[in-house]
Amino acid sequence: MAKIMIQGTASSVGKSLIVAALCRIFKQDGYSVCPFKSQNMSLNSYITLDGKEMGRAQVLQAYATGLEPEVYMNPILLKPTSDRKCQIIVNGKVYGNSTAMGYHNLKLKFKDMLKEHFNKLEEEFDIVVMEGAGSPAEINLRDRDIVNMGMAELVDAPVLLVGDIDKGGVFASLAGTMLLLKDGEKERVKGTIINKFRGDVEILKPGLDMLEDIVHIPCLGVVPYTRLQLEDEDGAVEFNKKAYAPIDIAVIKMPHISNFTDLDALKSEEDVSIRFITSKEEFKEPDLLIIPGSKNTIEDLLYLRQCGLEESIKEYSKDGKIIGICGGYQVLGSKIKDPHNVETDLGEIDGLNLLDMKTIFEKEKITTRVSAKLLNEEIENTVYGYEIHMGISEYSENVKPLFKIYNKNGEKVGYFDGAINEKGNVMGTYIHGVFDGVVFREKIINELRVKKGLKKKKSQIYEHMREKELDKLADIVRQSLDMEKIYSIIGMK
């Protein structure tokens, strides 16, 4: 089996998409391929078919290979709950909560498990494309590293180092990273990649020659800056407002926002513009307000209260349409109770009181794949998605459920999810990915179109669009990199 590891000079340099591109290229060339990232830190997660939780970046990479996402592609997921604490997910299940130092002391405990996962991949696939995290030059963390050079050494993988030229300082970041690596680690790096370049590559060539003289490894290519409709995992990317798009969707960007990949399918609609708001001054008059998921619902509810957005949301709810997803659904209720101090020690807190329901946090985390029917619709419809939450919500008789769940992790069930008020303009659901399918997305956007005097439209199938975008990404990267050299590095050609 062949393997290659993509590391970067920093976070957000484009490692995840370079890995996705290589996965698709190798697949196009006839090889069986699997992505692997030993440890991921993200608030964007996904639930596999067997009800386990993993990072979204490896989900996209799995799609690039044509595989169903599985937790062995991302055995450890860290979900920050505050600046210094995180929830640790191991093999898809909650391992516990820890401080940064506590986890640093734990890491070596997982080494054997990671090696075992990788050994199985070696037996099953022709090529494994690995991804590092942050930078391999974090010298204060090197002694217990299990995701960058520590992982590369564990499985004897060659490394390609990616730098982001769009931020500036790419030569210094690449040379500086190499400077801080140990001699054995430097030998493992077989090439550099310049990512997100805008302009004429000819202007860059003298710098590339000088860089090669300094670091003594070749630059394998320059990848142009390209806008693709593929999800971004590292942060709540600021969506570019479409000047020509008549449908304005505002999303509350809360401090602990999670699973904002729920917005990606909406972003693919040509006449829809999405913008994040963090203050009442930015609120304006959107056609739809979305309150997204949160890793700390209570603290984010307090944030809405403190910054004045609670007042704006309540005023908007008189005539505007609001959709809450997961944590955003919970804040719409009348009360949130936390008897086990899952999030804070407040015990309970009043919600926005826009839906007559209350949420009670429990110790056990719910992680399930679900299939649901949108209620009160004449058309045959199915919505697919997944749930990731720590609480259950109970609503009164005068609140109608939004969905009926009929399949949970592959088993037949029959229970209600979500709620919608009597007026029909405020609703919420626990289902992540609710907009990915055509049915619910098309229904909501067409309602907004009609309200603005616009014609209804058919929504495109998001999965088809994603496949086209992955092919486009692969074409760009194939044309930009020395693939013959990369195949030589992994011993395939």
UniProtKB/Swiss-Prot annotation:
Biological process annotations from GO: cobalamin biosynthetic process
Known pathway: Cofactor biosynthesis; adenosylcobalamin biosynthesis
Listed Pfam families: CbiA, GATase_3
Cystine crosslinks: none
Gene3D superfamilies documented for this protein: 3.40.50.880, P-loop containing nucleotide triphosphate hydrolases
Keywords from the UniProt entry: Cobalamin biosynthesis, Glutamine amidotransferase
Entry-linked NCBIfam families: cobQ, PRK00784.1
Role, per record: Catalyzes amidations at positions B, D, E, and G on adenosylcobyrinic A,C-diamide. NH(2) groups are provided by glutamine, and one molecule of ATP is hydrogenolyzed for each amidation.
The name this protein goes by in its record: Cobyric acid synthase
Protein source organism: Clostridium botulinum (strain Okra / Type B1)
Organism taxonomic ancestry: Bacteria, Bacillati, Bacillota, Clostridia, Eubacteriales
Gene this protein is translated from: cobQ
